[in-house]
């Protein structure tokens, strides 16, 4: 669970959905009928966890569904996703929100392509007083990947 607080601290400007160890176990290890591959990127000498990835193989590609870790280890995670996909002779694809797409491209500028999708993310907010203001503070700041949906 050390990676989740590190991730929250390194992206303070974003709203992040829950990515604790218990959530990952529920989301990726306890879902019947779907095989996910969970990778843990470690520091070579100490074995300290740097980042974790959730991947899913398809016949023509490898989906990178989730990332857990601080921003500074994103380049290591990208390299791990590419190495895993290469072993299975597939390209890597990832859905990421616009808020973090530039972070992924900056972490590994060679060979990454970013293109907008037409996916709309409906959000709303309620508190004890009822609906909040029409301008939501998280607009443009949601840290999302494909694994944050129920259909991947």
Q: Residue spans of the language-model regions?
A:
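Active-site/acyl-donor-binding loops of N-acyltransferases
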Residues: 27, 45, 52-152
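Amide-forming acyltransferase catalytic core, primarily the GNAT-like/NAT-type
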Residues: 1-66
């Amino acid at each position: 669970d050390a990676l989740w607080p590190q991730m929250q601290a390194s992206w303070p400007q974003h709203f992040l959905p829950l990515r604790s160890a218990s959530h990952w176990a529920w989301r990726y290890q306890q879902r019947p009928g779907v095989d996910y591959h969970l990778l843990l990127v470690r520091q070579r000498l100490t074995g300290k966890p740097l980042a974790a990835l959730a991947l899913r193989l398809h016949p023509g590609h490898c989906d990178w569904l989730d990332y857990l870790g601080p921003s500074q280890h994103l380049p290591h995670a990208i390299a791990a996703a590419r190495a895993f996909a290469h072993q299975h002779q597939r390209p890597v694809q990832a859905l990421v929100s616009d808020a973090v797409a530039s972070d992924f491209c900056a972490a590994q500028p060679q060979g990454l392509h970013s293109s907008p999708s037409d996916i709309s993310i409906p959000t709303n907010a309620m508190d004890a007083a009822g609906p909040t203001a029409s301008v939501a503070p998280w607009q443009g700041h949601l840290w999302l990947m494909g694994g944050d949906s129920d259909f991947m």
